[in-house]
Amino acid sequence: MNKTVGPPTITPTGLSGGMNSTTGSSSTSNIYSSYYKAIDQFQNKNTTDKDLHETLKQGPISSNLFYNNFLNELNNKNNNFNNNNNNNNNNNSNSNNNNNNNSNIVYSNNMSNNYNNNYNNRFKK
């Protein structure tokens, strides 16, 4: 039985280390807010490259730093997602579950490749 599989959740933990300024916690909140807003815009097919660039320019971190943290966070989530599915495959002999888990891994890898390709096309020109 096929099931719909969503992408892993992306959280801004990659931005937490060393990103706090002397102005207090509001700086971190601004970083998180900008991070989530840019991710939302990145996933919205109606968003133009100009809109996305404007969001990143208004954020409290540089586009390159955002790009690197975005990919690191995505790769961390993708690796955890794959590791969990690999563990499920090793511990579960039910062929239907194994097939579903393998599909999840392929989906997750494809999603990561799509994010990386889209991001490279939009920001690494």
UniProtKB/Swiss-Prot annotation:
Residues 1-27, 76-125 are annotated as: Disordered. Residues 18-27 have a biased composition (Low complexity). This is Putative uncharacterized protein DDB_G0277407.
